């Protein structure tokens, strides 16, 4: 079978031939339909993050945003033809309470592998195997968009963790602010705008018009905020202090500055990972005081569990195809991997399709 693999010693992506995997007892064989490409994949391909190969191998099959169809149920409770999206993390060894509880998204580093990212092969191949517990069903009508489930699950986790942090009182949020207009930021904005949690949404970027990302923001009903014209501490006076902020930029200063944009009792979740070390100058006393006296919170959020994937699949089923189509700027075959990984101002989400 064909697979797209990273050889980290170069680093280089290659299309290679690998044996079709044989499912072990309790695993199903999945035929890959499509795999989304995000910023993490590009950083992995460039050798900036992840890229650890499985034991005894010299390459890593990349790709973690996948949708596939059950080819061989192999005695599991799945049926041939079921459309599924795979989770990303797998436990290292046995005895993980996080794995036993279905909470690998909260497991400490070193206790898991991440398929297509580090330590375990991913899904950018014609077939892969997985246990049913690491697969989430998707409506057949959304099979062409199932690669959105994994990134959308991050938004669902952020909302879940935020609601848990505010479950001790009658919190009534009405506004949300997405920091970053890359593919995750635009997907997050789309989820927040089409959901029923918030009445108003905003999205931060650094683009001049005309621009396809600004078009997406405004077409779904959000308000574009240019960070070159308006700082985060100025944002509340011009627009409003927001109840929820979802950071995707990986810009270290945003971990601090986003708090300025929050309303009392507001929450910011951090999803972006900085590419390098950076020094941020702040008034520590004012920052500390603001968090305390206005009950604000900062949460780090990474990965997602099965319940978040299910919530993402439910959202996907209800979202118009036209909205999802606006987020996809290129679909390529596995032999067009250079084109699929190319990035430009016009790029939002690119996809590798194994049905081409």
Swiss-Prot record:
Positions annotated to bind NADP(+): 181-184, 206-207, 301-303
Enzyme class: oxidoreductase
Residues binding substrate: 40, 114, 150, 303
Documented EC number(s): 1.1.1.47
Transmembrane feature ranges: none
CDD domains assigned: glucose_DH
Any one Gene Ontology BP term: non-phosphorylated glucose catabolic process
Reaction(s) catalysed by this chain's protein: D-glucose + NAD(+) = D-glucono-1,5-lactone + NADH + H(+); D-glucose + NADP(+) = D-glucono-1,5-lactone + NADPH + H(+)
Keywords associated with the record: Carbohydrate metabolism, Metal-binding, NAD, NADP, Nucleotide-binding, Oxidoreductase, Plasmid, Zinc
GO molecular function: D-glucose binding; glucose 1-dehydrogenase (NAD+) activity; glucose 1-dehydrogenase (NADP+) activity; NAD+ binding; NADP+ binding; zinc ion binding
InterPro entries: ADH-like_N (IPR013154), Glc_1-DH_arc (IPR026583), Glu_dehyd_C (IPR031640), GroES-like_sf (IPR011032), NAD(P)-bd_dom_sf (IPR036291)
Binding residues annotated for Zn(2+), in chain numbering: 38, 64-65, 150
Cofactor(s) this protein cannot do without: Zn(2+)
Similarity comment: Belongs to the zinc-containing alcohol dehydrogenase family. Glucose 1-dehydrogenase subfamily.
Functional note: Catalyzes the NAD(P)(+)-dependent oxidation of D-glucose to D-gluconate via gluconolactone. Can utilize both NAD(+) and NADP(+) as electron acceptor. Is involved in the degradation of glucose through a modified Entner-Doudoroff pathway.
HAMAP family found in the cross-reference section: Glucose_DH (MF_02127)
Name listed for the protein in its UniProt record: Glucose 1-dehydrogenase 2
Native source organism of the sequence: Haloterrigena turkmenica (strain ATCC 51198 / DSM 5511 / JCM 9101 / NCIMB 13204 / VKM B-1734 / 4k) (Halococcus turkmenicus)
Gene: gdh2
């Amino acid at each position: 079978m064909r697979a797209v693999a990273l050889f980290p010693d170069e680093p280089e992506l290659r299309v290679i031939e690998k044996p079709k995997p044989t499912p072990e007892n309790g695993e199903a064989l999945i035929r890959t339909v499509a795999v989304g490409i995000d910023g993490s994949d590009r950083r992995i391909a460039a050798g900036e993050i992840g890229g650890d190969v499985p034991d005894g191998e010299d390459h890593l099959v990349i790709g973690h945003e996948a949708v596939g169809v059950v080819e061989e149920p192999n005695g599991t409770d799945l049926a041939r033809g079921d459309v599924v999206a795979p989770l990303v993390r797998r436990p290292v060894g046995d005895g993980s309470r996080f794995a036993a509880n279905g909470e690998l998204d909260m497991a400490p580093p070193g206790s898991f592998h991440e398929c297509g990212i580090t330590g375990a092969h991913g899904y950018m191949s014609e077939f892969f195997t997985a246990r049913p517990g690491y697969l989430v069903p998707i409506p057949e009508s959304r099979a062409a968009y199932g690669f959105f489930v994994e990134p959308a699950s991050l938004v669902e986790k952020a909302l879940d963790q935020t609601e848990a942090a505010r479950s001790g009182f009658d919190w009534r949020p009405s506004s949300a602010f997405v920091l970053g207009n890359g593919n995750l930021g635009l997907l997050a904005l789309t989820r927040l705008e089409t959901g029923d949690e918030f009445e108003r949404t905003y999205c931060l970027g650094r683009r001049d018009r005309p621009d396809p990302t600004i078009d997406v923001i405004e077409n779904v009903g959000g308000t574009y905020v240019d960070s070159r014209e308006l700082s985060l501490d100025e944002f509340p006076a011009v627009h409003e202090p927001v109840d929820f902020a979802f950071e995707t930029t990986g810009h270290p200063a945003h971990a601090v500055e986003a708090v300025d944009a929050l309303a009392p009792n507001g929450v910011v979740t951090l999803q972006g990972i900085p590419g390098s070390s950076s020094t941020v100058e702040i008034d520590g006393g004012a920052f500390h005081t603001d968090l305390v006296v206005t009950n604000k919170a900062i949460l780090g959020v990474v990965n997602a569990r099965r319940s978040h994937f299910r919530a993402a699949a439910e959202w996907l089923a209800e979202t118009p195809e036209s909205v999802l189509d606006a987020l996809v700027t290129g679909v390529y075959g596995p032999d067009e991997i250079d084109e699929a990984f190319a990035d430009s101002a016009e790029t939002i989400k690119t996809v590798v399709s194994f049905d081409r």
